[in-house]
C-alpha cells in the first residue's frame, strides 16, 4: 500500500502534529510527503526550509534537481519508505516546479498491497509506546545514514581538485553553470547526510564549499 500527501511549506506546519507522530510510528507500506518550498517568496507569505523541519521530526528527505530526477526520486522515495519503514519527505522548490526537461517513461510496475496489521505498541503514540519507538526510530535512521554513503543518488563528480562544492536540488544546476571546473558532491538524500562520503570528498579537494 502506498500513499502520498502534498502541501507547501506553510501547510507542513499545519500537518506537524500527525507528521511528528507518524515519524515515530513508521508505515506498513510506503508514505511520501511532498513539500514545496518557495525560496524568494514568489507566491508565499514567508520562507521556510522544509529540510530543517524534517530533521527535527527525524524524517529522511529526498531532493531532486531536475525534471528527470523528480520522476525517478518519487519512485525511489516509495521504495525506501517501504524498505526502512519510514515516511519520506520529498522536497521540491519553486524553480524545480517550473522547470522543463526530458523525462523517460517506463512500464507501470504493480506493487503488492500489504494488509493492515494491528499493532498498538507501534501505532498508538501514548508516552509508554512512544519511548520505545524513539529507540527504534534512532536505529532506523542510523541504518539509513549508513546506506546513504552508497546510494547512487549521492554521487561525486571529480574535476579540478582546487575547489569542491557540496550541493543538492536546483542549486546543483547553478553550480554546474557557474563553476564547471569544480568537483561536486551532489546529494539526492539530504537527510540523513552521508557523512563518510562527505569526509572522503572533503579530503580530495583544497577548498570546500
Kindly label every feature range from the protein language model:
Residues 64-208:
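Flexible, low-complexity linker and terminal segments
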Residues 1-82:
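Thiamine diphosphate
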Amino acid at each position: 500500500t502506498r500513499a502520498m500527501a502534498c502541501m507547501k511549506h506553510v501547510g507542513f506546519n499545519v500537518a506537524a502534529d500527525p507528521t511528528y507522530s507518524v515519524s515515530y510510528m513508521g508505515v506498513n507500506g510506503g508514505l511520501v510527503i511532498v513539500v514545496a518550498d518557495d525560496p524568494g517568496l514568489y507566491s508565499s507569505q514567508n520562507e521556510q526550509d522544509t529540510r530543517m523541519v524534517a530533521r527535527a521530526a527525524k524524517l529522511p528527505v529526498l531532493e531532486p534537481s531536475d525534471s528527470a530526477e523528480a520522476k525517478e526520486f518519487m519512485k525511489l522515495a516509495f521504495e525506501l519508505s517501504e524498505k526502512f519503514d519510514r515516511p519520506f519527505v520529498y522536497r521540491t522548490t519553486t524553480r524545480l516546479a517550473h522547470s522543463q526537461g526530458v523525462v523517460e517513461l517506463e512500464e507501470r510496475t504493480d506493487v503488492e498491497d500489504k494488509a493492515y496489521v494491528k499493532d498498538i505498541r507501534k501505532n498508538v503514540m501514548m508516552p509508554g509506546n512512544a519511548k520505545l519507538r524513539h529507540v527504534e526510530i534512532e536505529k532506523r535512521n542510523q541504518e539509513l545514514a549508513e546506506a546513504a554513503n552508497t546510494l547512487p543518488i549521492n554521487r561525486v563528480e571529480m574535476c579540478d581538485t582546487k575547489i569542491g562544492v557540496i550541493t543538492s536540488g536546483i542549486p546543483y544546476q547553478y553550480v554546474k553553470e557557474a563553476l564547471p571546473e569544480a568537483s561536486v558532491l551532489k546529494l539526492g538524500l539530504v537527510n540523513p547526510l552521508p557523512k563518510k562520503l562527505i569526509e572522503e570528498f572533503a579530503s580530495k579537494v583544497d577548498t570546500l564549499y
